[in-house]
Amino acid sequence: MAYAQDGNTIRDSLKWAITILKKSEIEFPEIDADTLLIYVLSCDRTRLYTNQDNIIDEADICKYKKLIYKRASHVPLQYITGCVEFMSLDFTVDERVLIPRPETEILVETILDKAQGNILPDKCVIIMEIGTGSGNIAVSLAKNLS
């Protein structure tokens, strides 16, 4: 990225994307615009916000526009980026897998509370999940029960 006063800057790109997403009635246009540009540029939020006047190269602009239009057509953000956070863990998702819902974290926390209260020393807990999908429930339980 180069420095410039105007053109295809981070600031300009975010402003454009937010406008497109608002017109499509996306619930959180600012967050989605930021997240997709972070994804395209492979940077963190701090770098995005502290380099607003940097120019984005043409290939990244094209990729970003495609992703914004995809999101504007209501494709879930997680399917676009291929990633979702669940219980502080990152999981890979695509259209073949349901996106883990925040409410499912309550289910996992409830199972953890019940299992941890019943684990005897030198005993293992066996938990079976059917229809695993992204594996978020089984992996979260395994990580927190080990």
Where do the protein language model's features map onto the residues?
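N-terminal auxiliary segments of SAM/dcSAM-dependent transferases
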Residues: 2-81
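SAM-dependent Rossmann-like transferase core, predominantly class I methyltransferases
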Residues: 62-146
